A protein has these predicted regions:
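Sec/Tat-exported extracytoplasmic proteins
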Residues: 47, 61-68, 81, 88-92, ...
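Extracellular/luminal Protease-associated
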Residues: 123-229
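Soluble metallo-hydrolase cores and metallopeptidase-like ectodomains found primarily
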Residues: 37-39, 114-154, 219-281
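N-terminal capping segment at the start of a domain
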Residues: 36-71, 213-218
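Bacterial N-terminal signal peptides that target proteins for export
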Residues: 2-14
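Extracytoplasmic/secreted proteins, especially bacterial periplasmic and envelope-associated proteins
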Residues: 35-42, 52-55, 59, 76, ...
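Noncatalytic luminal/extracellular "stalk/propeptide" segments of secretory-pathway proteins
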Residues: 29-32, 58, 62-173
Length: 281
């Protein structure tokens, strides 16, 4: 048996810890069954039926709270994770130094359809750049995906705010598949839109819920392409913008974002080691 390292980051904490607790519970037996399939099934069964992990998740979410990389809450989560892991039967638990992105949301974002009093529910996408201090006001062009942007081209995209409005496919039983079918608008959409001259991007939140709470995640800017502000609208706010565009194709949107990316911040992976019987080194 070789040495096993289990690395817990707060981003993957829940799923990793399910496996961790299950593995350590089963690993305490003197002799494991040689039938790997049986052992794997036992691990999954333990993961799916144990309530311990949910208690830990409850503490992580409700006692420690948000854990954006580089934040004080993320540091608290690291210390808590090390403490929790030290209670299990690892041979060694330690922290590994690393640096993580340090993005700050800043003052609350504002988005409003020109001519309407009620603001839209909006949040900047993680790692987005900010708008100018006074915000941006521009015409909105609605698209259903990245392909639409490429078809429309620079002539119709330049100087506008691109509204990626493809919804999550509610017909798909697998929510993961539904999410995957729409998330490219968030991750790649802003850079694609910027390539064709867009000055900002708003997206319909990627998710299955019908509410007005924006779902963010991160966007990934491509090298060599200008970074433009990118934000997520709550589903109901996206519906409002969609309806406004049906009534008037020349709708203008005001958006103001105050986010900033600072130098990478120090953080840690938390690592647990189980030494093998045959090859402990």
């Amino acid at each position: 048996m070789k040495k096993i390292k289990i690395i817990i980051s707060t981003k993957l904490f829940f799923s990793s810890l399910i496996f961790l607790i299950s593995f350590l519970t089963l690993a305490q037996r003197d002799k494991l069954d040689v039938n790997d399939t049986k052992i794997i099934k036992e691990i999954f069964d333990e993961s799916l039926t144990s309530r311990e992990t949910y208690k830990l998740l409850d503490h992580l979410c409700n006692k420690i709270g948000h854990r954006l990389s580089g934040s004080s809450s993320a540091s608290k989560a690291v210390e808590w994770t090390e403490m929790i892991m030290s209670k299990y039967n690892f041979d060694k638990v330690y922290k590994q130094n690393l640096y993580v992105p340090n993005w700050k949301r800043g003052e609350p974002e504002v988005a409003k359809i020109i001519g309407q009093k009620k603001e839209l529910s909006v949040l900047a996408l993680g790692m987005s750049v900010s708008t100018p201090k006074k915000g941006i006001t521009a015409e909105v062009i609605e698209v259903q995906g990245i392909e639409d942007v490429e078809v429309l081209g620079r002539e119709k995209i330049k100087g506008k705010i691109v509204f990626f409005n493809r919804p999550t496919d509610q017909r798909l039983i697998s929510t993961g598949s539904a999410y995957g079918g729409a998330v490219d608008q968030r991750t790649s959409g802003p850079s694609i839109a910027a390539k064709y001259g867009a000055i900002a991007v708003v997206i319909r939140s990627v998710g299955t819920a019908f509410d007005d709470v924006p779902h963010t995640g991160v966007t990934r800017y491509k090298e060599g392409i200008k970074k433009i502000p990118a934000a997520a609208l709550g589903v109901k706010s996206a519906d409002r913008l969609e309806l406004a565009l049906k009534d008037n194709a020349n709708v203008k949107l005001f958006i103001k974002m105050n986010c900033i990316t600072l130098e990478d911040a120090p953080s840690h992976n938390v690592i647990g080691e189980l030494m093998g019987n045959e090859f402990p080194d």
